[in-house]
Amino acid sequence: MTVRIGVVGTGAIGRDHARRINKVLGGAKIVALSDVNRASAEAVKNDIAPDAVLFATGEELIASPDVEAVLVTSWGATHEQYVLAAIAAGKPCFCEKPLATTAEGARRIVDAEVAHGKRLVQVGFMRRYDAGYVALKQAVDNRIGAPIMVHAAHRNPSVPEQYVTPMAIHDTMIHEIDVLRWLLDDDYVSARVLFPRSAARSHAKLKDPQIVILETAKGTIIDVEIFVNCHYGYDIQCQVVGEDGIASLPEPMSVQTRLGARLQNDILTDWKDRFIASYDVELQDFIHAAAKGTASGPNSWDGYVAAISSDACVAAQETQGAAVAIDLPARPALYQ
């Protein structure tokens, strides 16, 4: 069976996902495209999906009987409306993060999916599909005993001037917020944010670096360093301290050289290079589930919890180190 997929939003990530589906993965084909910039959709049609039909709006694409599943890769503020339309149409939907730009919007999606009675939404938290994180989770679940502490870091070489302090949470740490919750199988109960002295490469509207301290319901303490102007490379670190041992996220594969009296490994500089393979795996997972009329992987509840947790972290940026509670409602049975 070939799943007929429509793409709403043909910017950089939408174009890349369309390429993946038509050129790399199996079991699916791009049959429809829509973007507010018609020229963008036309370019994807010409370069990647020549048989695709162009639609004036995302809603028209979703309603088309020729479309069996939907990719929402449009501007973040539009995600909610398109995901809700896909649920109303009963069509599996892959939505890039964020699920919605507010926790209230994410909750509306959860409520709509629960009312529908079947999982239809997969959220694009691709780190769960990274081979290193999968191996780390196996170690956490089976080898090192109950987790006590987690030390994590998310470092970028640089960010543009328009990147401001809250974006360190909503745009950057959002990945840690999801993947660490999945890694520990535990929910957060509070967040604190500490600010060291700002790095010289920061700017007036960005406090960088920052340290976020999360506490979980089971009592695990997590510290996450966010340093988006580290200069030296793109570097993701994660170490879980358990009762019986320690497990660390593997480093990306790199050629080690012994040259000029130095032992060296290269460090990546681009997030796309670090996690490119996980995008293939997550979309293949979506295709397999969509062929059965459902969805798997990170779900709407995960997107909702990430929104609540990130909002709490942003609030904690203003409390001079005081903890902010993360209050989660009961999880619906659909997501148990």
Swiss-Prot record:
Keyword annotations: NAD, Oxidoreductase
Q: What is its EC number?
A: 1.1.1.18
Entries under Pfam families matching the protein: GFO_IDH_MocA (PF01408), GFO_IDH_MocA_C (PF02894)
User: GO terms for molecular function, please?
Assistant: inositol 2-dehydrogenase (NAD+) activity; nucleotide binding
**Stored SUPFAM superfamilies:** Glyceraldehyde-3-phosphate dehydrogenase-like, C-terminal domain (SSF55347), NAD(P)-binding Rossmann-fold domains (SSF51735)
Task: State the Gene Ontology BP annotations.
Answer: inositol catabolic process
Q: Does the keyword NAD apply?
A: yes
- Give the family from UniProt: Belongs to the Gfo/Idh/MocA family.
This molecule's function is given as: Involved in the oxidation of myo-inositol (MI) to 2-keto-myo-inositol (2KMI or 2-inosose).
**Which PANTHER family does this chain map to?**
INOSITOL 2-DEHYDROGENASE (PTHR43593:SF1), PTHR43593
This one is known as: Inositol 2-dehydrogenase
Organism, per UniProt? Agrobacterium fabrum (strain C58 / ATCC 33970)
